[in-house]
């Protein structure tokens, strides 16, 4: 078992850190606000007064942070105290350029960096079934693998630094586009009088089905838009994707439309609701909601 520092105890970080404790790892935890640290301490974690203090105790240092700015700031702090033999892994969704800067900062101190974004949401973190997309050196990946296995099920080394993040950005592009497409299709079905539960059962086993449909359509029906992944967070990811596509010369037609819809949703006060709340942008002009289908 390893000594693991975990920095960033949000909706993903807290259950991931809890899984590490359940697996028998020793966890040194830090978060900017105190309640998540206290909750983890009650489960057996050690409290750290700063990110640097947590990292100083870790053989493996994990971060799960909400914004590019927070990742940049934290890694500049961590690099100052990094030491040879440490492995740092960032589970945040950020730009490839930021991943490269983190790797360079740590390499100058003899430490190794893995970009290791995850997919599966808080439920996947709690169940230990996350997909972990890793970029970096094979030796560092193999050393960190037992740690990742505490919260991940599908764990892949995708290539060198940045490769894991590239795969995650492709995933997030599809998440954004699928969420918009499912919202549009579900509202059309409701306006045509189709029962949404029947739509889910039938299309869920047809070519039009997808993981995002299975995730979002039940939320359309229940009207539970409490955020697992918020509109604001996915808009952040789509903005990163937009910039990466522009710099790479890739036209982002569907992705651009999805980004505009998420931006509009934020402007309508939906920023902190779950991304499934995007459906409201179609329901209002259609004069119906997915849970109450009506024809005519």
Segments and roles (model prediction):
Residues 4, 94-176:
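Rossmann-fold dinucleotide-binding core
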Residues 16-17, 102, 147, 188:
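Hydrophobic residues within alpha-helices
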Residues 51-112:
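Rossmann-fold NAD(P) dinucleotide-binding segment
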Residues 1-63, 86, 92, 122, ...:
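NAD(P)+-binding Rossmann beta1-loop-alpha1 motif at the extreme N-terminus of oxidoreductases
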Residues 127-135, 156, 160-192, 201-215, ...:
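Active-site-proximal catalytic alpha-helix in oxidoreductases
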Residues 161, 165, 209-275, 282:
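Interdomain hinge/lid region at the active-site interface
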Residues 33, 67, 137:
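Residues in the short beta-alpha loop(s) of Rossmann-like NAD(P)-binding domains
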């Amino acid at each position: 078992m390893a000594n693991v520092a975990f920095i960033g105890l949000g909706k993903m970080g807290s259950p991931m850190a809890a899984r590490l404790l359940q697996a028998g790892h020793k966890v040194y935890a830090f978060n900017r606000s105190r309640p998540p640290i206290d909750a983890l301490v009650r489960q057996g974690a050690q409290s750290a007064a700063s990110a640097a203090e947590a990292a100083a105790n870790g053989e493996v240092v994990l971060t799960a942070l909400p914004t590019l700015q927070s990742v940049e700031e934290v890694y500049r702090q961590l690099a100052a105290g990094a030491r040879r033999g440490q492995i740092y892994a960032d589970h945040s969704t950020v730009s490839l350029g930021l991943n490269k800067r983190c790797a360079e900062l740590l390499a100058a101190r003899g430490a190794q960096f893995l970009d290791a974004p995850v997919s599966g949401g808080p439920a996947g973190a709690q169940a230990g079934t996350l997909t972990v997309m890793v970029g970096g050196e094979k030796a560092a990946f193999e050393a960190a693998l037992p740690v990742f296995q505490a919260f991940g099920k599908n764990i892949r080394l995708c290539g060198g630094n940045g490769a894991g993040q590239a795969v995650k950005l492709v995933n997030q592009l599809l998440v954004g586009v699928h969420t918009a497409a499912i919202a549009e299709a579900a509202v059309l079905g409701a306006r045509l009088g189709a029962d949404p539960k029947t739509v889910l059962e039938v299309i869920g086993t047809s070519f039009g089905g997808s993981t995002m449909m299975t995730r979002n359509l039940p939320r359309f029906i229940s009207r539970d838009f409490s955020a697992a992944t918020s509109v604001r967070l996915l808009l952040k990811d789509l903005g990163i994707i937009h910039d990466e596509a522009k710099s790479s010369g890739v036209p982002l037609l569907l992705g651009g439309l999805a980004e505009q819809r998420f931006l509009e949703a934020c402007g309508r006060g939906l920023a902190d609701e779950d991304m499934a709340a995007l459906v409201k942008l179609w329901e209002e002009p259609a004069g119906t909601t997915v849970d109450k289908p009506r024809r005519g």
